[in-house]
């Protein structure tokens, strides 16, 4: 669990209310934000792991886009483009069940192969919504995926997600495949 308090002080130049209002007419340079995240992971059966995650942001201010809580993407709400939506405050939840390592069923091809099922969601809120925009947009998806490695240095992640609740550019029923690769030297 982590929680942090962030305060922005007006220092002039580009860090001024005048500059901030060029992107958001209700924004002020003198704002504060509370951000928190928590995660829990538990082995529920031999080889099976359940993981829950929560991220949150709270403020009473109308923020510029770079300070807003963003949702959508491979490490947020799968099934959506990266940061498909952002707002002044919000929460993101994820629940993922990872199965046992089944790599031995494929000979020596994989060092590790585990399948996952997941549900992701986010709720956001604008403190001063712009005319025509949703006051409290929300995203939700579910899906399946795999975590595999050919060696300890090369890790792959593949997730296929279906949108349950979306935004106009990615509505209910939309499907997206996320693929990531990580390597270490």
Task: Kindly label every feature range from the protein language model.
Residues 1-113, 118-121, 125-127, 171, ...:
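C-terminal outer-membrane beta-barrel translocator/porin domains of Gram-negative envelope proteins
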Residues 91, 111-115, 138-144, 150-156, ...:
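A short pocket-lining beta-strand/turn micro-motif at the edge of beta-sheets
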Residues 118-143, 149:
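Outer-membrane beta-barrel transmembrane domain signature
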């Amino acid at each position: 669990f982590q929680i942090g308090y962030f305060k922005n002080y007006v220092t002039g130049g580009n860090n001024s209310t005048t500059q901030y209002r060029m992107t958001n007419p209700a924004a002020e340079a003198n704002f504060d934000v509370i951000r928190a995240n928590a995660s829990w992971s538990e082995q529920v059966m031999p080889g099976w792991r359940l993981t829950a995650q929560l991220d949150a942001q709270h403020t009473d201010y109308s923020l510029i886009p770079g300070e807003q809580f963003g949702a959508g993407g491979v490490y947020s709400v799968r099934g959506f483009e990266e940061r498909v939506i952002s707002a002044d405050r919000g929460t993101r939840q994820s629940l993922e069940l990872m199965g046992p390592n089944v790599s031995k069923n494929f000979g020596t091809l994989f060092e590790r192969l585990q399948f996952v099922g997941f549900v992701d969601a986010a709720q956001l809120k604008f403190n001063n919504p712009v005319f025509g925009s949703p006051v409290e947009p929300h995203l939700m998806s579910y899906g399946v995926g795999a975590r595999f490695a050919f060696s300890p240095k090369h890790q792959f992640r593949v997730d296929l997600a279906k949108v349950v609740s979306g935004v106009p550019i990615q509505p209910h029923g939309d499907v997206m495949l996320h693929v990531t690769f990580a390597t270490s030297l």
